[in-house]
Amino acid sequence: MKKRTSRKSPGSKRLQNADQLWPLRFTLNGRKVQARVKPTQTLLDFVRLELELTGTKGACLEGECGSCYVLVDGRPMNSCLVLAPQVQDRKVLTIEGVSRGDKPDVIQQKFIECGAVQCGYCTPGLITAAEALLARNPRPTRGEFLAGLEGNICRCTGYNTILRALQEAADAMGMKR
């Protein structure tokens, strides 16, 4: 009887490499970060588990809800879908980087004043998306606000208080310019 030899599948080498740590360099909230990460680790997990910045939330983990939004080079991205190595040499902003010290920024303050926060789980993603929108377009229409928040789901507020907070934030930011 012929002895069977073990043959590894072509994908097994890739699976072995998944356990290796890769060097990672990027800027997070204005500070340089250097670390070693698994190539399969998401940016969400890296930020929350390794850096202990828990403001960014993981809800659906499928890129459908927007609670995990971060800005990568100024563009909102679902950090649950971005692998940590993909932000090599890029700038990442989380909700922790939005506020100025211990004071909320204008958008955060307007969310508070307008009652646009209920359970709060979606709030970091909404505020992060709004930061990107208002940086690109300081005077958005209601339709542009809705389009800018298209990837964010809020199950509590019904969006009216969120839209009012964003309009007031845009107005307040316009007065400061």
Regions found by a protein language model. Give the residues of each.
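Signature of N-terminal electron-transfer/Fe-S-associated modules in redox systems
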Residues: 1-177
